Amino acid sequence: MKRLPAVAGSFYESDPKKLKMQIEWSFRHNIGPRDIPKQTYEKKKRDNLFFVVPHAGYIYSGPVAAHSYYYLVSEGRPDVVIILGPNHTGLGSYVSAWPKGEWETPLGSVKIDEEILMQLVKESEVIDLDEKSHLYEHSIEVQLPFLQYFFDDDFKIVPIVIMMQTPEIAEFLADAIYNVMQKNPDKDIVVLASSDMNHYDPHEITVKKDEEAIEKIQQLDYKGLYEVVEGKDVTLCGYGPIMVNLILAKKFGKKAYILKHATSGDTSGPKDSVVGYLAARFGS
């Protein structure tokens, strides 16, 4: 079963050569890390297990996303990348995993880790196996070319989209991921929370709203983050995935490190109506 790209040619370049250049542009951008990371091939225990990465068009959020990937790549190739994204389309189940096969992008195909996926399904009791949720959803797809640029097809993924973004669902998912990671100590597993920040306010308002959410992220306060999003009109689209990583970070004794916060006004556009983007890592 192959999932074909839904947003190649719109969110990112559909030509492989141009796509690689777009990824390099993201790393070298003055909002980005300004350098392309060197991948280590020495296998050692990974420190940064969990990340927040944005998922907009690369011309807008690519330079911010590059900060998270800089740290991920610098610690070497993971065996499995669990990618949690919000469900923008409203299709499918409350929590949906692509069941098997592979995902294709202009840079090639990446296989699903069906063994880890089925362990998560068994542990969580909230994950449905459902392709419909993923067919047109971009939040996971846009992460793959960044990973493929460095690791080719030498890693596997577990793609999960979350429509029901509540603290209770986040707790179920975090517990399941924690248990699976504990049961597979020989597998190098990282978890990406794919999310943009506040949407379509002027730059100054978006920065202020985002800062309220970022404060809760720094505190690993997942319920506080939920309250900010729900109670203060902070239109952060992937708060469910971020809540999962906040819970996981606390379980693993990790701290939050904000790598970069910017808006589309900083990267590629006018500042009267912007989207906020955050790169964060959770490590020692």
UniProtKB/Swiss-Prot annotation:
Pfam families: Memo
Disulphide-bridged cysteine pairs: none
Gene3D superfamilies according to UniProt: LigB-like
CDD domains: MEMO_like
Recorded family membership: Belongs to the MEMO1 family.
Protein name, per record: MEMO1 family protein M1425_2054
Species name: Saccharolobus islandicus (strain M.14.25 / Kamchatka #1)
